[in-house]
């Protein structure tokens, strides 16, 4: 899980989701792409 000030999709499998007011990226193909804004 990367924590970044700005999150971007890193590949076509990445999805933007909002959980508890936080913007997160989840990726089914590459778990390294998981990110959270904060």
Swiss-Prot record:
Domain of life according to the entry: Bacteria
Record's GO cellular component, any one?
A: cytoplasm
**GO: which molecular function terms?**
structural constituent of ribosome
Ribosomal protein among keywords: yes
Tell me the GO BP annotations in alphabetical order.
translation
What are the UniProt keywords, alphabetically?
A: Ribonucleoprotein, Ribosomal protein
- State the coiled-coil residue ranges: none
Looking at the keywords, is Acetylation present? no
Q: InterPro entries given for it? A: Ribosomal_bL36, Ribosomal_bL36_sp
Q: Which family does it belong to?
A: Belongs to the bacterial ribosomal protein bL36 family.
The cross-references to NCBIfam families, in alphabetical order and at most eight, read:
rpmJ_bact
Name the UniProt record assigns to this protein: Large ribosomal subunit protein bL36
Please name the taxonomic classification of the source.
Bacteria, Bacillati, Bacillota, Bacilli, Lactobacillales
């Amino acid at each position: 899980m990367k924590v970044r000030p700005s999150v971007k999709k890193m590949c076509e499998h990445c999805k933007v989701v909002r959980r508890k007011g936080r913007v997160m990226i989840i990726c089914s193909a590459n778990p390294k792409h998981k990110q959270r804004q904060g």
